């Protein structure tokens, strides 16, 4: 069965196509993505109106590219992200998916963006044991308890202020490195000393929430360090600042993720979201999972960021479990809860 997925929750227009066999195994047939990231760069972050307009311009070309790569005229089912995400951006993708589903006379599946990140980390088709998912991006930093792909997830904790990816972007702007901050900070951090500056780790005291995150204090600490150096006329090592900041972020993320696994008895940690492409996060997560006897599953770098494959993968899993399609009247929900894998 051929399933096509459309992703448009933020600044990427993604169309992915997967082939679902009778055993539930998935084969990726196409992964086409158009990003409007450069359109947002001069604003230092994603502008919702610009993102929506970019989706409108990119949807048809990206769809054509995906169908061409997959070598098909039409799929057997169409899925789309209906939340969470930017309201206007979600509307573009969901509306397109409904139109294509109606024109092709195939079922439509309205699915959860966050569930897609979990599904794409388990593309091998093997049954997913009781797991914890750490989803880290510019808009989300969450720990989720996962019983199986396509089933409702339970939120164990989330950020109380800035998402991890958002903190990267803000620190990058502070250092004059531009937007987005994740890739450039990761690159510079490799040349710096992660122990050079003792930046704080938020919510790491015994009295703090075990599974929640906070990165606003870290962001402020970086700003104060830079301001103090400028007042003193000192030249800072941008590489050391990046390395020390990144170490603080990854230390907290991986420590709490492994602890969450231990707290709920999960033997697998799933890592997803754009920040999951970060080299230090992947490295430290692997080290700590190995030490704790936990299996780490991480998607390829390309599938960490938003894409249509993850939406197709989640819908395919729902189809394999016998779920019917969603109504074409289903609306989008920018604040869709993780407990809702599919909207009917």
Curated annotation (Swiss-Prot):
Record's catalysed reaction(s): L-threonylcarbamoyladenylate + adenosine(37) in tRNA = N(6)-L-threonylcarbamoyladenosine(37) in tRNA + AMP + H(+)
TM region positions: none
Binding sites annotated in the UniProt record for Fe cation: 113, 117, 306
Alphabetically ordered keywords of this record: Acyltransferase, Cytoplasm, Iron, Metal-binding, Transferase, tRNA processing
One Gene Ontology term of the molecular function aspect: iron ion binding
Main subcellular localisation: cytoplasm
Cofactor(s) required, per the database record: Fe(2+)
Subcellular location as annotated: Cytoplasm
Binding site for substrate: 135-139, 169, 182, 186, 278
Enzyme Commission designation: 2.3.1.234
Note on how the cofactor is bound: Binds 1 Fe(2+) ion per subunit.
SUPFAM superfamilies (UniProt xref): Actin-like ATPase domain (SSF53067)
Protein name: tRNA N6-adenosine threonylcarbamoyltransferase
Annotated organism of origin: Corynebacterium efficiens (strain DSM 44549 / YS-314 / AJ 12310 / JCM 11189 / NBRC 100395)
């Amino acid at each position: 069965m051929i399933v096509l997925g459309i992703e448009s929750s933020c600044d990427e227009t993604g169309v992915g196509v997967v082939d679902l066999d009778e055993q539930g195994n998935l084969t990726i047939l196409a992964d086409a993505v158009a990003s409007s990231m450069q359109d947002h760069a001069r604003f230092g972050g994603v502008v919702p109106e610009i993102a929506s307009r970019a989706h409108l311009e990119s949807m048809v070309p990206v769809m054509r590219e995906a169908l061409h790569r997959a070598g098909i005229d039409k799929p057997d089912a169409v899925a789309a992200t209906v939340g969470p995400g930017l309201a206007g951006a979600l509307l573009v993708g969901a509306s397109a998916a409904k139109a294509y589903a109606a024109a092709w006379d195939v079922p439509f599946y309205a699915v959860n963006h966050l569930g897609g990140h979990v599904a794409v980390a388990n593309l091998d088709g093997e049954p997913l044991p009781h797991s914890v998912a750490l989803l880290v991006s510019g808009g989300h930093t969450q720990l989720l308890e996962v019983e199986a792909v396509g089933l409702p997830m339970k939120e164990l904790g989330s950020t109380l202020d800035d998402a991890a990816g958002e903190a990267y972007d803000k620190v990058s702007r502070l250092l004059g490195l531009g937007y987005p901050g994740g890739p450039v900070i990761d690159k510079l951090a490799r040349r710096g000393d992660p122990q050079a500056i003792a930046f704080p780790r938020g919510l790491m005291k015994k009295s703090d929430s075990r599974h929640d995150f906070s990165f606003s204090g870290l962001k402020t600490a970086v700003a104060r360090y830079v301001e103090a150096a400028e007042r003193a006329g000192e030249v800072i090592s941008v590489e050391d600042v990046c390395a020390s900041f990144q170490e603080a972020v990854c230390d907290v993320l991986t420590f709490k993720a492994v602890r969450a696994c231990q707290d709920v008895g999960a033997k697998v940690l799933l890592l997803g979201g754009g920040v999951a492409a970060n080299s230090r996060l992947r490295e430290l997560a692997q080290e700590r999972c190995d030490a704790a006897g936990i299996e780490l599953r991480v998607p390829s770098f390309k599938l960490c960021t938003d894409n249509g494959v993850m939406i197709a993968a989640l819908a395919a899993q729902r189809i394999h479990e016998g779920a019917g399609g969603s109504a074409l009247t289903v609306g989008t929900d920018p604040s869709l809860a993780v407990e809702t894998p599919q909207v009917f």
